Amino acid sequence: MDVKSKHGHIKSNPEESLLFRNSVSKNIAQLSSINYADRNVQAALEQLSERKFKNEREARKQLPFEVFSDLIWTNGSIIKELSELSSQTLSVQSQLLKVKNSIDSYKNEWSKKTNDAQILLNSYETFCEEEALIEEKLKNIEIFEKNFVIMDDDLIHLTSSTDVDDRFYLILDKAQEIHDSSDSLFASLSGFVEYSSFEEIVKKMSRYIEAAFEKLFRCVQTELSDPQTAQTLEANSHLKKAFTKLFSEPTMVNKSINLIVQARQQILSTAYLTALTRGDFLSSSRPIELSAPDTVRFIGDLLAWIHQTIVNEKELVEALFAARKRQIQLNPFPPWDVPNVLEDQMNSLLDGSLYGICRPLSSRAQTSVLDLSDIVRLYNVIEILGFYREAFSKIVHDECIILRIIKTLEDFTYQRMKTVLDDELYTISNTNLSITDDLLPPDFVTTFLRNANSIFKIRGASLSVQGVDELPFKMLFMQLFDRILEICAAMTEDVRPPYKGIILMLNVLDSCTNYVGRYTFLNELFEYLQEKTTYYKNNLTTLLNNDYIAQAGLSDLLQKIADTTDDKQALKNYLHSWKWDQQIDKFSTFIRKTLSETIDNLQLLTSPIVTNQVLKETAISFVGAIETVDKALELSNLERRWPLSTEELLIAMNVDSMDTLSDIGQSDIDNLSVN
C-alpha cells in the first residue's frame, strides 16, 4: 500500500505496512474514545490550538489523520537519521582506528624520546655534580687563599722597612689568623694524618709574625726616643695602637713594658728635678726646694707632686691598656691574657715608671727628716706620710713600690723620733736629777708629756687613721713611758723614807694617765699605766703597813703570835712576859708623831683617789694587826687597853671609820700580819 502525504511517497515492506496500519488503527480507536471534556485533553487541545489548530469538530475529525501522517513522516525521518548515524558511526570507527594507530605511533615515538631524554637528564645530573664539585674546589681554593695565603707584596710590606700603617696591621692580623687556624687544624689532625703543608704554613707565618713584631717594636722604639713623644704618649693614638698590638703578643709584652718604663723614667726624673728646682711655669707653682727650711711643708709638697704624678701615670697606663682590655672582654682569651695577668702587667708598668722618682724622693725625704729634732714635727711628718699612703692606696695596687717607699719613710721617721727621744732621755739619765720637796714629777717628765700630748692631739684629729700604723705608734710610746719610769725609779733609789720615792712614782704615773686617758686610741697604754699605778700603790700600802707596825712596836709581837698559834700555853706565857707598858708608850709615840708625818706625806699624792685608797688599805691592814693582838690576848685571858679605840685609831689615820670597819676581814689581817 502506498501512502501519500504532503511529504511525498514512502515505500515500505508489506509486513511493515500491516503493522503500521494496525498501530494506526489502534491509536485512532483510542483517539475516538477520548473524553474531550477532560481537562487534560482540553489542555492538550489548547496546546494544539496554539499550534494553529482549532478545537472544532472538523478539526478533531482530521486530527487522527494528521497525527498518523505526522507519525509516519517522523518515523521516516528517524529511520533516515539512524541510517545517517550508522554511516557516521562507521566513519567515527574508522577515524578512531586512525587515532588509535596515531596514538600507538606517538607512544612509540614518545617512549623513544623519553629514553633519550632520560639519558640526557642523567648526563645533565652528572654534569651538575661535577660542576658543584668544581665549584666547591674553587671555593675551597678561594677560602685557602683567603685564610692561608698572603700575597707577596703584602709580605714585603709586613716585613720590610716601610712605615707602619693601617695596611700593616691588617696584614699582621691576617698572618696571625693564618698561623692560629693552621696550628689548630694541624693539631687536630696530626694524630691521624700528616699535613706537612700546614706545618710549613705555621712555621712560615711564625717567621713573618716575628719579623713584623720586631719591625713594630723598632718603630715604637724609634718614636719613643723623642722626649716630646714620650711625654705626650697618652695623646698619641698611633703609639697606643702599636702598644695594643705588642701587648697581644706574649713574647713582646715584657719588652714593650720595659721600653715604656725606660722612656717614662727619664720623663719623670726630668719632671721631678724641674718641680724641685724650677717649679711649673704653666701652673705658676714655685720650686719645691723653697720649702726645704720647713721640713713638714717640704715633704708635703713632695708628696703632693708625687700624688699628681701617680694620677697621671695611672691614667696613662689605663689608656695604653684600654684597647687590649676591651679585646679580652669581647673575645675568649688564652692563659697568658687572662684579666689577672693583664692587671699584673699594668701594675708592672706603673711600678717601673714610678721607680725612677722613688729613690731620689726617699733619699731627699730622709735627709730632711734627719735634720729634724722636734718630735712633734717629726710626728707631723708621719701623719703626712700616712695621709698620702692612704690616698695612694686608693689609686695603686697594694704592692706598689710607692706604698713601700712611703712605709719605709714612715718607719724611718718613727726611728728618728725614737732616736731623738732616746738621746734626750740618755742625756737626762746622766744628769744629776733631784727630787723636789713636793714630790711632783720632774720637769723633763712634764716637758715630755706636753710634747706627747701635742702628738696625741694630732693623732686624734688625724685624717689618716687608716694610713698611719697604730702598732709602731703604740710600741714607741710604750717604750718611752717605760724609759721615763725607769729614770724616775732610779731617782728614788736613795730617797728616805722609801715611801716618798713611791709617792713620786705614783705622781708621775698620775700625770701620765691624765694625759693618756683622754684618748681612746691609747687604751692599751692607759691600761698598762694603770697596772703600774696599782703595782706602786700596793707597794706603798705594804711599805706603810710594815712601817706602821715597826714604829708601833708590834713587829716582834705579831711574829711571836704567828709562830705560836698552835701552842696556846706558850703564847700565853709569852704575852704575860711582854713589856706592855713600853709597848703602850711606843704605840702612843707612833700615833702622835709617825702617823701624822706619814699622813702629811701622803697628802703629797696628786691623785685623791690613790691617796684615799692607800690610806684606807693601810688602815685596814694596821687595824687588822691590832685586832690580831687583841684576839691573842683574849685567848690568853689577858686584857690590855690601847690608847685609842679602833674607831678613834681610824679617825687618827684620816679614814672613814664606819666604812673601813666594814671592809676589815680576817683573811686580810692574816695576810698582812705575816708581811
From Swiss-Prot:
Annotated localization? Cytoplasm; Nucleus; Golgi apparatus membrane
Query: PANTHER family, from UniProt?
Result: COMPONENT OF OLIGOMERIC GOLGI COMPLEX 6 (PTHR21506), CONSERVED OLIGOMERIC GOLGI COMPLEX SUBUNIT 6 (PTHR21506:SF0)
Family stated for the protein in its record: Belongs to the COG6 family.
The organism encoding this protein is Schizosaccharomyces pombe (strain 972 / ATCC 24843) (Fission yeast)
Q: Name one GO cellular component term.
A: Golgi membrane
The protein's superkingdom reads: Eukaryota
Q: What does this protein do?
A: Acts as a component of the peripheral membrane COG complex that is involved in intra-Golgi protein trafficking. COG is located at the cis-Golgi, and regulates tethering of retrograde intra-Golgi vesicles and possibly a number of other membrane trafficking events.
Q: What is the membrane topology listed in the Swiss-Prot or TrEMBL record?
A: Peripheral membrane protein
Instruction: Please report the name of this protein according to its UniProt entry.
Output: Conserved oligomeric Golgi complex subunit 6
Q: Which GO terms describe its biological process?
A: intra-Golgi vesicle-mediated transport; intracellular protein transport
Tell me the InterPro entries matching this sequence. COG6 (IPR010490), COG6_C (IPR048369), COG6_N (IPR048368)
Keyword tags: Cytoplasm, Golgi apparatus, Membrane, Nucleus, Protein transport, Transport
